[in-house]
């Protein structure tokens, strides 16, 4: 009996010593800014064993600080190397080696659960490691996975996704190569309202998406439209060749660096590319590319590109490109382009382009363009262009080097030609046209289709025969004037322009006319203030008469035979100085239409 007891005690002691080993020994290490080699020497001394390692592999000269009281050797080494070194006990030594990752392969076939037919372009992925692949035309897939726990293999969850099919999950044992197949069922068809089921795969349908993304990458985005992950950073050479591999299109990053181009789910930080960035979802806060940026969601922050920016939702912030900007749901902020800006949503802010701005919905702010601006809805602000401006409803100012066009103008139109259907503001130009007017038109020719159109034939104290065309409305109308005296020895000709305002039974007008007296060198200028009482004498016919005050300026008194020598004629003028004289006269005549 005594011998049996001694045997059991001896066996337990051996078992305890074996279980403890060198990694299980307890040590205390408190060292500040010491080389790793010194820390290992201290552990060796306390544990009564030896390390075996290559100095370069463990970075023996690196300076570290360690605080470990009554910890196992393994715990101290884990703290020291953070999983980068593997430990192996051999006799009385503890080998330190590089920690090589373990990989295993999973393969199989994916078939249609209803027909049994193989499914082509189905996505198979692991959501933690962000590793994915797609089935070939026989429905076969092969996936290389990393073993997460080297001491105890853990099961891995794979997901099979395909557009119009239900997602299917496969549990895979870790640690060894294996085959596993699955049949997935089509999604149940249901009737819904109008929804954008593939709202985050739209970038693949753009021209740029079709050119720079492969068909497999576009299929992947369709299959995984419900799966997205967040990661702190990524880098890539081209779409699919980077940190997140084939799943890069489903990852939202905080920092994204693309050597040539990248394809990501979105951004919540900074993205820089040597050529292009393509993001399926929203982008915040800064995006830079030498060529172009394409965003499937909203853009908030700063977006700069050398050629083109395209946002398939809205922009809030600053957007600039060397060639063009396009936004589907408008912008709020500043939009600058070397050639053109296009927005199909409501806009608020400044839009400036070297050639043209085209906005399809309401705009609040300013539009500046070298050639033209177009707002297909309401413009609440200013349109300034070198050639033309177009707006449906203008509540602000249109300023163009040639022509302004609007359906309704409640502000100001300034250009060579201004045209509007309903005028409730002011037009200033050489030619103004309005279908109907409750505003003011100031120009050489101002036509209101449903306003004044009158032909005047009348006599004045200066010229017996005068013609004038009056157009506009009661608030303000314009006059184009011509007059003549054909009497031998008293010839004279005049031409000019004027504006006037009509009241119930009378009108007030100011005109400016040039008076030709036989020589263009002696031509004078008349400024005339006149008022007239008018009376209707028939349908579309009125008689008018009234006084006039005329100021005449001429810096040359040379006389030409056959032309007037005395102004106004029947009586003399009152001279104010050598160049300026005035007189009081009249005008009387008829108006038609």
Language-model regions, residue ranges each:
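Predominantly the C-terminal beta-signal and adjacent terminal strand-loop region
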Residues: 435-438, 474-476, 529-593
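Extracellular beta-sheet/turn segments enriched in Thr/Pro/Gly and aliphatic residues
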Residues: 92-101, 174-199
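A short, solvent-exposed loop/turn motif at the edges and junctions
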Residues: 81-86, 150-172, 186-188
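Short, acidic Ser/Thr/Gly-rich low-complexity loop/linker segments typical of extracellular
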Residues: 129-144
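Short acidic/polar beta-strand-loop edge motifs in secreted extracellular
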Residues: 20-42, 53-77, 98-100
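Residues on the lipid-exposed face of transmembrane beta-strands in outer-membrane beta-barrel proteins
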Residues: 257-259, 416, 428-430, 444, ...
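Transmembrane beta-strands of outer-membrane beta-barrel pores
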Residues: 261-263, 276-278, 292-294, 308-310, ...
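Structural motif
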Residues: 109-120
């Amino acid at each position: 009996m005594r011998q049996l007891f001694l045997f059991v005690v001896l066996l337990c002691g051996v078992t305890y010593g074996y279980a403890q080993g060198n990694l299980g020994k307890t040590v205390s290490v408190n060292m500040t800014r010491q080389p790793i080699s010194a820390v290992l020497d201290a552990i060796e001394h306390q544990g009564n064993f030896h390390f075996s390692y290559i100095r370069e592999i463990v970075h023996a000269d690196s300076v570290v600080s360690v605080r470990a009281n009554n910890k196992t050797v393994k715990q101290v080494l884990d703290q020291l190397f953070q999983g980068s070194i593997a430990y192996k006990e051999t006799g009385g030594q503890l080998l330190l080696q590089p920690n090589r990752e373990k990989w295993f392969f999973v393969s199989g076939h994916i078939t249609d659960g209803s027909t049994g037919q193989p499914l082509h372009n189905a996505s198979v992925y692991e959501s933690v490691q962000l590793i994915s692949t797609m089935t070939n035309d026989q429905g076969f897939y092969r996936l290389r996975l990393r073993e997460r726990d080297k001491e105890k293999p853990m099961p891995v969850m794979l997901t099979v996704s395909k557009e119009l099919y239900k997602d299917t999950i496969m549990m895979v044992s870790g640690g060894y190569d294996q085959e596993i197949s699955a049949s997935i069922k089509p999604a149940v068809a249901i009737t819904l309202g109008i929804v954008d089921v593939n709202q985050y795969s739209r970038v693949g349908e753009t021209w740029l998406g079709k050119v720079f993304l492969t068909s497999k990458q576009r299929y992947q985005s369709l299959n995984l439209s419900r799966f997205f992950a967040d990661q702190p950073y990524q880098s890539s050479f081209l779409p699919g060749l980077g940190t997140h591999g084939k799943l890069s299109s489903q990852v939202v990053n905080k920092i994204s660096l693309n050597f040539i181009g990248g394809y990501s789910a979105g951004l919540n930080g900074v993205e820089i590319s040597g050529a292009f960035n393509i993001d399926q979802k929203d982008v915040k806060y800064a995006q830079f590319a030498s060529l172009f940026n394409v965003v499937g969601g909203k853009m908030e922050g700063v977006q700069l590109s050398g050629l083109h920016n395209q946002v398939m939702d809205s922009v809030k912030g600053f957007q600039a490109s060397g060639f063009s900007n396009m936004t589907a749901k408008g912008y709020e902020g500043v939009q600058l382009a070397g050639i053109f800006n296009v927005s199909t949503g409501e806009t608020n802010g400044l839009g400036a382009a070297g050639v043209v701005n085209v906005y399809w919905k309401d705009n609040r702010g300013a539009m500046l363009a070298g050639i033209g601006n177009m707002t297909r809805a309401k413009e609440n602000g200013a349109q300034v262009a070198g050639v033309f401006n177009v707006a449906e409803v203008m509540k602000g100012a249109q300023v163009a080097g040639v022509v302004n066009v609007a359906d309704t103008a409640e502000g100001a139109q300034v250009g060579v030609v201004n045209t509007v259907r309903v005028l409730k503001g002011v037009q200033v130009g050489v030619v103004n046209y309005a279908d109907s007017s409750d505003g003011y038109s100031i120009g050489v020719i101002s036509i209101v289709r449903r306003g004044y159109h009158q032909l005047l034939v009348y006599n004045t104290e200066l010229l017996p025969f005068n013609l004038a065309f009056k157009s506009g409305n009661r608030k303000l109308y314009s006059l184009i004037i011509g007059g003549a005296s054909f009497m031998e020895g008293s010839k004279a000709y005049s031409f000019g322009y004027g504006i006037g305002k009509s009241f119930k039974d009378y009108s007030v007008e100011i005109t400016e006319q040039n008076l030709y007296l036989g020589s263009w060198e002696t031509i004078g200028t008349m400024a005339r203030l006149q008022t007239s009482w008018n009376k209707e004498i028939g349908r579309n016919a009125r008689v008018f008469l009234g006084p006039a005050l005329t100021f005449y300026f001429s810096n040359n008194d040379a006389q030409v035979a056959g032309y007037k020598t005395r102004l106004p004629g029947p009586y003399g003028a009152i001279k104010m100085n050598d160049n300026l004289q005035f007189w009081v006269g009249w005008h009387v005549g008829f108006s038609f239409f």
